[in-house]
C-alpha cells in the first residue's frame, strides 16, 4: 500500500503496513496554526484518544493531507 507520510509525500509502506492513517488534533497553538496532522502507515488503525480524530483506509494514496478552512481566522473590524 502507498500512503502519504506528509504533505504530498507518498511512500510505499513496509511489509505488514497495510493501513494508511491521518491523525489530527489540537495543541496549545491550535488557534494560531490549526490542527496538528500526523500521517503514515500502520498494521492496524491507531487507537482513538479523546480529542484526536483518526481516519484509516487501505487503498493507495487514500490519506491525503486534510483540506482545512482555518477556523482560527478572526473577522477584522467591528460588525
From Swiss-Prot:
What species is this protein from? Acanthophis antarcticus
Q: What is this protein called?
A: Alpha-elapitoxin-Aa2e
Protein location: Secreted
Q: Which cysteines are joined by disulfide bonds?
A: 3-20, 13-41, 26-30, 45-56, 57-62
Q: Which UniProt keywords apply?
A: Acetylcholine receptor inhibiting toxin, Disulfide bond, Ion channel impairing toxin, Neurotoxin, Postsynaptic neurotoxin, Secreted, Toxin
Q: Which residues form a coiled coil?
A: none
Task: Tell me the CDD domains matching this sequence.
Answer: TFP_snake_toxin
Instruction: Extract the Pfam families matched here.
Output: Toxin_cobra-type
Query: Principal place where this protein is found?
Result: secreted
InterPro entries linked to this entry: Snake_3FTx, Snake_toxin-like_sf, Snake_toxin_con_site, Toxin_cobra-type
Q: Give a GO cellular-component term.
A: extracellular region
Q: In which tissues is it expressed?
A: Expressed by the venom gland.
Q: Which family does it belong to?
A: Belongs to the three-finger toxin family. Long-chain subfamily. Type II alpha-neurotoxin sub-subfamily.
Q: Which GO terms describe its molecular function?
A: acetylcholine receptor inhibitor activity; ion channel regulator activity; toxin activity
What Gene3D superfamilies does the annotation carry? Answer: CD59
What SUPFAM superfamilies does its record include?
Answer: Snake toxin-like
Q: Which superkingdom, per the lineage?
A: Eukaryota
- Taxonomic lineage of the native organism: Eukaryota, Metazoa, Chordata, Craniata, Vertebrata
Q: What else is known?
A: Exists in two forms which are separated by reverse-phase high-performance liquid chromatography, but which have the same sequence and molecular weight. The existence of cis and trans isomers may explain the two different elution peaks.
Q: What does this protein do?
A: Binds with high affinity to muscular (alpha-1/CHRNA1) and neuronal (alpha-7/CHRNA7) nicotinic acetylcholine receptor (nAChR) and inhibits acetylcholine from binding to the receptor, thereby impairing neuromuscular and neuronal transmission. Produces paralysis, clear dyspnea and lethality on mice.
Amino acid at each position: 500500500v502507498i500512503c502519504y507520510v506528509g504533505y504530498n509525500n507518498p511512500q510505499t509502506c513496509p511489509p505488514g503496513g497495510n493501513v494508511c492513517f491521518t491523525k489530527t488534533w489540537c495543541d496549545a497553538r491550535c488557534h494560531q496554526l490549526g490542527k496538528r496532522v500526523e500521517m503514515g502507515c500502520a498494521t492496524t488503525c491507531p487507537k482513538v484518544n479523546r480529542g484526536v480524530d483518526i481516519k484509516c483506509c487501505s487503498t493507495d494514496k487514500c490519506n491525503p493531507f486534510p483540506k482545512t478552512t482555518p477556523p482560527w481566522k478572526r473577522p477584522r473590524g467591528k460588525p
